[in-house]
């Protein structure tokens, strides 16, 4: 295989054209677990070890949060996802019967704003509680809004993990809906499912809560270059009573992964192509495109 000069950035993008002159991007990656294409400069915020997840809020704060979420944010995100991405959600019926019960919802991480906007539409009228990067709460004013919209920053250390785990337990006991992106990093318009770890499945395994997943697929759109999105909801998947917590972590992870892989095959438009790039010494070698 012919060696190529090493590029300064592994997330290099090029505009190319296919046979019918339709432009699309190519993202080169080397690590499916850790490469990120969000194009957002991370502040690498670390939460303090004593970060308080269970802050007590008064009636006025709760009322303000309700109005912001249901009266302002929800209508806006619904219109945005429908108009900009042509988003349709299918198979929401599997959630019927679980509106009053707590559950965990996992999704593939393929959009920037839309990935924050889709879960509220899936689980409505339940309010979303979504795991977010600590950068989201770096500034006090923004932190307050993030909390009102259901954002929960992921713990940054083993010490802060204790409070974080306590928050997950409390949400389960209160029958809340928790949204998690197990792939962790954003790959815009990726039509496959990346391998992900089972760490985030510890919580439904410990609390014996049902698990659902949603898979965003990309469909060809008439008269527009960007594809429309269709979101499929699957589940529920339940922890097995005869399994240990660790065994259920793996079991639930595998259930979600296989369901996502199956749904992802329904994508028929590749707006952004992802190409595996291997390294060999000081040279970067371009591999085959990732299907």
Residue ranges and their predicted role:
Residues 98-158:
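Catalytic core of membrane glycerolipid acyltransferases/transacylases, capturing the structured
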